[in-house]
Curated annotation (Swiss-Prot):
Reactions mediated catalytically: an R-cob(III)alamin(out) + ATP + H2O = an R-cob(III)alamin(in) + ADP + phosphate + H(+)
Taxonomic source organism: Vibrio cholerae serotype O1 (strain ATCC 39541 / Classical Ogawa 395 / O395)
Residues involved in ATP binding: 30-37
Stated name of the protein: Vitamin B12 import ATP-binding protein BtuD
HAMAP family (alphabetical): BtuD
Length: 251
């Protein structure tokens, strides 16, 4: 379980609290500059904050980086590193140290996640030979290996900052299959997202931020209403039903 009590980051993010259960998928949404990345970085223990964040039994503000790495994975928006690595080397570095499994079991988990993201044919390529979408899928695979319950029983939380941003439509579908897999294994997934229709379909819980303030929180159905979204995003939005499912239309 993830417990957040009165989390605040100076004037960028005003106090908010939440409780997320194992296996839940949370989407953090809102206009650019509303505090999404700040919230995720604080949850990950990467920036100072006031209040408290508990990941399982771990107090995030008091934990070392190595302790944090055992309990959560955090994927920020980032460029490729300047050093040279092949994809399989990058993924191997993502596997937690001192894994109490046979090498074949570790290789099997790497293979399954690589196949799920359609990067299994790129394992022997340099990361600098990858397109933006390919590199993002490698990064997603690495973060999943870090907190895979098969490899790391201590892991509780997967934090992604706009993971779909560099992905095309087909690759985004792979991403949501991966999210379903990781949540199905008991991890809590908290991610920033701009595709509100994906949030409507896939999020168990939604945090809507506006100017550093938690404007709404609840299920996707409760938060993603026409009135609420129009007031925050300042644009015309319609919610319609198509084949029995809700969809958002934007001007």
């Amino acid at each position: 379980m993830i417990r957040v009590n009165s989390l605040q980051v100076d004037s960028r993010l005003l106090p908010l609290s939440l409780q997320a259960n194992a296996g839940e998928v949370w989407h953090v949404i809102g206009p650019n500059g509303c505090g999404k990345s700040t919230l995720l970085a604080a949850l990950a223990g990467m920036i100072p904050f006031s209040g408290s964040v508990q990941v399982g039994g771990l107090n995030v503000s008091q934990a070392s980086l190595s302790e944090l790495a055992r309990h959560r994975a955090y994927l920020a928006q980032n460029d490729k590193p300047s050093f040279q690595l092949h994809v399989f080397q990058y993924l191997a570095l993502s596997v937690p140290a001192n894994v109490a499994l046979e090498r074949s079991e570790v290789a099997s988990e790497i293979d399954q996640i690589s196949r799920l993201l359609n990067i299994d044919d790129k394992l022997h390529r340099s990361i600098h030979q990858l397109s933006g979408g390919e590199w993002q899928r490698v990064r997603l695979a690495g973060s999943c290996l870090q907190v895979s319950p098969v490899l790391n029983p201590s892991a509780r939380l997967l934090i992604w900052d706009e993971p779909a941003a560099p992905l095309d439509i087909a690759q985004e579908s792979l991403l949501y299959r991966l999210i379903e897999r990781m949540a199905g294994q008991g991890l809590t997934v908290i991610m920033a997202n701009h595709d509100l229709n994906r949030t409507l379909r896939h999020a168990d819980q939604v945090l809507l931020l506006s100017r550093g303030v938690l404007y709404r929180a609840g299920s996707a159905k409760e938060v993603l209403t026409q009135e609420v979204l129009q007031s925050v995003f300042g644009t015309s939005i319609r919610r319609v039903e198509l084949e029995g499912h809700p969809h958002l239309l934007f001007d």
